[in-house]
Amino acid sequence: MSLWGQPLQASPPLAVRQPPTASSGPSTSPPAGATLNRLPEPLLRRLSESLDRAPEGRGWRQLAELAGSRGRLRLSGLDLEQCSLKVLEPEGSPSLCLLKLMGEKGCTVTELSDFLQALEHTEVLPLLNPPGLKITVNPESKAVLAGQFVKLCCRATGHPFVQYQWFKMNKEIPYGNSSELVFNTVHVKDAGFYVCRVNNSSTFEFSQWSQLDVCDVAEVTDSFQGSMDGISESRLQICVEPRSQRLVPGSMLLLQCVAIGSPMPHYQWFKDESPLTHETKKHYTVPYVDIEHEGTYWCHVYNDRDSQDSKKAEVTIGRTDEAVECTEDELNNLGHPDNKEQTGQPLAKDKVALLIGNMSYWEHPKLKAPLVDVYELTNLLRQLDFKVVSLLDLTEYEMCNAVDEFLLLLDKGVYGLLYYAGHGYENFGNSFMVPVDAPNPYRSENCLCVQNILKLMQEKETGLNVFLLDMCRKRNDYDDTIPILDALKVTANIVFGYATCQGAEAFEIQHSGLANGIFMKFLKDRLLEDKKITVLLDEVAEDMGKCHLTKGRQALEIRSSLSEKRALTDPVQGAPCSAEALVRNLQWAKAHELPESMCLKFQCGVHIQLGFAAEFSNVMIIYTSIVHKPPEIIMCDAYVTDFPLDLDIDPKHANKGTPEETGSYLVSKDLPKHCLYTRLSSLQKLKEHLIFTVCLSYQYSGLEDTVEEKQEVNVGKPLIAKLDMHRGLGRKTCFQACRMPDEPYHSSTSTSAGAGHFHSSQDSFHDVYHSHLGNADSGMPPDRCHCSRTPHTFISNYPPHHYCQFGRSNVPVETTDEMPFSFSDRLMISEN
C-alpha cells in the first residue's frame, strides 16, 4: 500500500514515496471533529442565512431545541433571548448568534450536520460535507520504444471542478496540467516513475504510481526493426531477443530480453524447459559460467492481457562447439598444447585490450559516441576472453600512464589490442591521439603518437598487435614537426583498422540521445566472428560501403603485415602460469575490484544498503536503498555526499532516481531498481581512499521536526584508482613526437609537470619488468626514446607566423529528410 492507502503499480524509490507538496495547500473543508467556532466566517453566514429564511418548525429555535437534547449544548433562556434580539440590529442574525454560542459550548461539525439532517436542511449539508475527490482512472505502467507516441491518463471526479498536475518522481512537470500526459516522441531520458495530483477548491488526492520504461532503439533486434512501423503502444511485443553465445569457462553470460506493452511486461527465464528461480528481470546474468550453465535459454514475457515466449538461445560452454575424435595419446596431450601445430590454430598466451574514449574536451568540441563505443566494445572483447581496461576522458599525463600500465600487461605471445575513440589527426603517416586537456591549438607534443606505442609493444614480443583508431586523420596545419621514427621490427603481426581514410574525417551517429561512431556501429556486428582479423575488417569495410550514410564521407582503411591466420577468437593457451602471467593477472584484477556491498545500520533502526557497479574501469555507480524502516518513522530520506574533491562531482547530478539522470545510460538495465544513484567518473584522479558520507533524514510519527544522522564510509580505492595512475611509473615513456635536442623535454602544458620525477608506488608492478629505471633526475631516460629528429631546426612547410584564435569547425554535416541520423564531426583541426 502507498502512503495514501492506494496500491502501487510500481514502487518508486523509498526516498520519494511521500507525495509531492500540493500547490493548493491544506484542505479548506471543515474537519469532521472541528468545533463550529473554527469554521470560516463566510461559511457560518451562509448557514445562518438558510436558517433565518427557513419556514416555521425548521428554523433556529428548533435547532436550539435539538442541540439542548445533548446536555452540554443546552442553552439558557437568556442565551435564546440574546439570539432573538439580533433581529433588531441592521445586519443581525439570530441563527448566526446561535451557531456561535453552540460553538463556544463545543458543538462539532458532525453534530451540526446531524441536527441539520434531522431538520431536513439538505440544501446546506454540502457546505459542511463537500463531495470528495474520486480518481476513476489511474495511469497505467507501460514499456515503450524510444520514438513512440505515449500517453499517460488520469481521470477524476469532484465538486465543483478538478485540476491536474503531473510529477516525475517528486519534480513537477511543466505544462503537465491536464488529465493526459502526452509524449509525442518519447526518449530514453523520459523513463521513470510518474504520479498525478488531482485537486478541487478544497482538497487533493494522488493517483497510483505509474512506471514508464523506454527501450532504446539501438538495442532492438534486427527482425523487430522491420515491423516497427505498425507498432502498438499497448500490445505486448518482444523487441530484444536473447542471443546464442559460445563462451569459455569463467567468462560472463549475459542474456537479455526486452518487451514493450501496456500494462508493464513481467519476465520469467527458463533453462531447458525449467523456470529459473528468482530470475524475473529483463536480463539473466551468470558472472562466471561453467559447464553446468550450458543449455537452451528462453524468456516468458507476460502481463494481464497477453503473453509471449522469446526465441531460444543456445549457450555453449567450452573451447569448441564441435565434437572431435582422438586417440588416447592425443587425449592425454590435450592439457599441454605446447605448440600451435597440434591444434592447427594459433594460440594466444593471453589477450589484453586497452580502450580509451575521450569525450569531454576542455577546449574543443565535445563528443558523444566514445561513451557507447567503448562500453559495447568492452562487452564484446570480454566474450572473446580479453582482459579489458576501459577508460574515459583522460588527460595527456593520464593517457601516458594508462599506456604504461597496458604495456605491463603485455608479454611474449600475448595479443594486444588498443582502441581509441576521440579527436585525432595524422601528419606524415603518424597518427596522434588527442587528450581531453589538449590546448587550442594542439601539436604533437600535446598528443600521443600511435606509432611510438607500437614500437614499445613490439619490444614485448607480442603475438598480435591490433590498433583500432576511431578518429579523424586530417592533417594538423598547426603542427609542422616531422618526427623521424626508428624503423619498426618486421614482426608480421601488426593490424591497423582506421575508421576513416587518410586525410578524411570520422563521424558519429546520434540517435535517441545516445551515439555510436560509424566504425563501431558496423564493427560490433562482426567482432565475435571466428575469422582472421584482416578478413573480419574487410567485411566491416564492405558493410560500411553499403550504407548510404557513409558514402562519400567515411570509408574504413586497413593496414596489415599479418602473415598468419590470427583472429581475435583464438583460444588462450592453457599452459601453466608463469610468474609474469601471475603478475599480469593480478595487475589486471586490481584495476577491476569493486567495493563490497554493505548494509549501514543507523541508531534510529533504519538500514541502508550500499551497492557498487562498474560502468568503465574509471567510472563507478553507487546505488543506495532503504531496506528497513521502523513503523514509528513515517518518512526517511538517504543520500550520499562529501566526496573527495579529486573527483569533482556535481551535487546536482548525484542521488538521482534513475541511472539515466546521472548520465549513465548503459548499465541501467543491470542495476537494481528503486534506488538512488550517483555516478563517479575519473577515478584515476583519486589520490587517497574514497571516503564519503551517507546522510539519513527521518521524521517520527506525530512530530514535525526532521532528525538527521550521518555515517562516514571508506571503500578504499575502487577500480583503476588502485593503480595510482596519477603518480605514474617514475618515467615518461616517449609516446609523443621527440623534440629538438636543445629543446626542453617537458611541454608547457601542466599535464607534464613532474613527469620526470620518480614516485614509488606499492600498487605498481613495474619493477617486475624493468629493474633499471635509468637516471631518475633525467627528464627522459635515453633508453625510452625510439625516435630521432632532424638536426637543428624542425622541418616546416609553412613560415613562422602568429596564430590567432583557433576556429572550431565541428559543424554537423547537413542531412536530407531521407537520412534519419545526424552527423557530428570529430575533427578538431580547421583552417581559419
UniProtKB/Swiss-Prot annotation:
The active site is at H423, C472. Its EC number is 3.4.22.-. Residues 1-39 are annotated as: Disordered. Disulfide bonds join C154-C196, C257-C299. Keywords: Acetylation, Cytoplasm, Disulfide bond, Hydrolase, Immunity, Immunoglobulin domain, Nucleus, Phosphoprotein, Protease, Repeat, Ubl conjugation pathway. GO terms for cellular component: CBM complex; cytosol; fibrillar center; perinuclear region of cytoplasm; polkadots. Residues 131-207, 218-314 form the Ig-like C2-type domain. One of its GO terms (biological process) is innate immune response. Residues 19-39 have a biased composition (Low complexity). PROSITE patterns: CASPASE_P20, IG_LIKE. Belongs to the peptidase C14B family. This is Mucosa-associated lymphoid tissue lymphoma translocation protein 1 homolog. It comes from Mus musculus.
